[in-house]
Amino acid sequence: MIATLPDEAYAIVEGRHADPFRYLGPHRENERTVVRAFLPEAASVEAVDEKGGTAALERIHDAGLFAGLLPNGSARYQLRARFGDTIVDLEDPYRFPPILTDFDLYLLGEGSHQRLYDKLGAHLMTLDGVEGVGFVVLAPNARRVSVVGDFNFWDSRRHPMRVRGSGYWELFIPRATAGDHYKFEIVSAQGHLLPLKSDPMAFAAEMRPSTASIVLDPERVPHPRPAPAGISALTSPMSIYEVHLGSWRRKDNNDWLSYRELAEQLPAYVRDLGFTHVEFLPINEHPFDGSWGYQPTGLFAPTSRFGTPEDFAALVDACHAHGLGVLLDWVPGHFPDDPHGLAHFDGTSLYEHANPLQGRHNDWGTLIYNYGRTEVVNFLVSNALFWLERYAVDGLRVDAVASMLYLDYSRPAGGWIPNKYGGRENLEAIDFLRRFNTEVFAKFPNATTAAEESTAWPQVSQPVEFGGLGFGYKWNMGWMHDTLNYISMDPIYRKYHHGQILFGLHYAFSENFILPLSHDEVVHGKRSILGRMPGDHWQRFANLRAYYAFMFAHPGKKLMFMGCEFGQDREWNHDSSLDWHLLEQESHRGVQSVVRDLNNLYRTMPALYELDCDSFGFEWIVTDDGDRNVFAWIRKGNAARARCLVIANFSPNVYYDYQVRVPFPGKWREVFNSDSAHYGGSNVGNIGEVEAVGLVPELSLTIPPLAVIFLTPED
């Protein structure tokens, strides 16, 4: 070993150099080209130029640091290293030009780079005629970052990265390739070695409990065909089937179905039932099955539980081929504190708030994104755009928006920090959500977004330019709570809660609402939807059929969690399949038939969807018959005679000669009756049609028990 080495040499061998390119690789010194290479375990190293000339490099440090003059002064060369009896020709990663351009660094610095996924992460590329992988990661407060993986024996000494701009570390590793596993080893500014970190921008990841990122070849991921145009528009029917991919169906040994096996079964099933969209619970990579995907660590990687990114693309394509829109649950509100993830990423609170009063979610034990950081907002917005572009999904449902909007969300007095005006509104989160929606609709005008927002925050689905948050839709949590509470009561008590059905129409058009019967309503001791229904066996199923019909006749788009469509009796369990054997029973088949027929009516009857989000599309007819638990209303479409009369009877009694005024004289046809024998009902009804007579046209109807009927005017 040469005794008079510069400090930079020791920084290299000790793994603490922030810019190894300043010392390693080729350098012009005294009009000669000197090359230095750090190859631990190498017995000897030669430099071989493009003409075949060779020059032995001298070992200048016993740890494996070599240096020497390049033959012929060439800047293009390889390293020929001997490891025991093996001789290997290597490309020197420290001779290649930068990955990020100055313009990239400028955009990254100001937070306006809208395609982070094109620059950060691991990308196959060719530099100076050599194939390899370029790695880029944000770690502005790190002292040193190294790439470790299959290509370097997971030895952090071999591939330290260089830092550029405002904390972006990069390195091109020749001959690394698709399928290689990798992580980042980070040393904090204080010199502490952190747990190995997965790539925040990884496009593929290992199956839990392993946590390595995987280099992906994007050419192998086919771009799914688009969904039908306008499928998510306010004036289009929108009926969403919400699915947890790991428990929709399972194999006989309780193993998951793969993405491709799901592609063969799920889209056809959903389309047969008449739904227009399928919504997947979060498919981002996540370490804990019991989080259902809502605690992701790999926001850019489809979970490897069910296959590869190529397989997930095939599932999206199959849904589109069946005419279904694809929505993803998206979680920009919080993330888990697993040591391989985003938490304390570079030794500091890079993605989260440092103060736990702002940065930790007490209910879920997760960390909250710091929306005041440009890099964090850019990361999240880019992630949203990534799924819409790369996998052609048709929209994103944003989870737990209320927890983002309020600084005091689920916090005791004194357990939160007010904003700069002394209020509880999270101003940075508001700005983030507005930017997210603005960017999504600017680049993907046919896509949509939906907010799970459980408070009365105003203008959630109003445009940003009018002061709103800019979402396409908002989940109507108030409707869900009120109506489930009402329908769960014994009919004898419902007259005292008549207002729970009426109240929703006071605000039904203040937002573009989705009516959600989601996964959250069939877990944690709440029972299944069927499990909430009162009465004996027949009454429970009649109540359920009536409730679903009421939902489809109510203004707002529809969402139903898997299993609800056939009356799953037990709560949802993410560790097992739905109870498909229940379809052997007539009562459960009847519920499934009701859902199929309601979907088909909803999709084909403009009165039920065209003005879902417009008060002109709804008119109460009967609101004051609480003693008999009866309601009636008209749904309207744009055409003059696009009308649907809805009668809901939430009592177990039959009412004969029930008078209901209607807008048109003549015949009205009964197009749906949830009490039909076809569904398992008592088959009470109006024998197909009724004549409206009188100066003010009225129908004299037979109203079946615990049932909802639809009637439309004949042309």
Curated annotation (Swiss-Prot):
GO function term, MF aspect, one: hydrolase activity, hydrolyzing O-glycosyl compounds
GO cellular component, one term: cytosol
GO BP annotations, alphabetical order: glycogen biosynthetic process
Keywords, in A-Z order: Carbohydrate metabolism, Glycogen biosynthesis, Glycogen metabolism, Glycosyltransferase, Transferase
Active site: D399, E452
Catalyses which reaction(s): Transfers a segment of a (1->4)-alpha-D-glucan chain to a primary hydroxy group in a similar glucan chain
Glycosyltransferase in keyword set: yes
EC number annotated for this UniProt entry: 2.4.1.18
Pathway assigned in UniProt: Glycan biosynthesis; glycogen biosynthesis
Broad enzyme group: transferase
Gene3D superfamilies hit by this protein: Glycosidases (3.20.20.80), Golgi alpha-mannosidase II (2.60.40.1180), Immunoglobulins (2.60.40.10)
HAMAP family: GlgB
Complex formation: Monomer.
UniProt record similarity statement: Belongs to the glycosyl hydrolase 13 family. GlgB subfamily.
Protein purpose: Catalyzes the formation of the alpha-1,6-glucosidic linkages in glycogen by scission of a 1,4-alpha-linked oligosaccharide from growing alpha-1,4-glucan chains and the subsequent attachment of the oligosaccharide to the alpha-1,6 position.
NCBIfam families: branching_enzym (TIGR01515), PRK05402.1 (NF003811), PRK12313.1 (NF008967)
Name of this protein: 1,4-alpha-glucan branching enzyme GlgB
Originating species: Rhodopseudomonas palustris (strain BisA53)
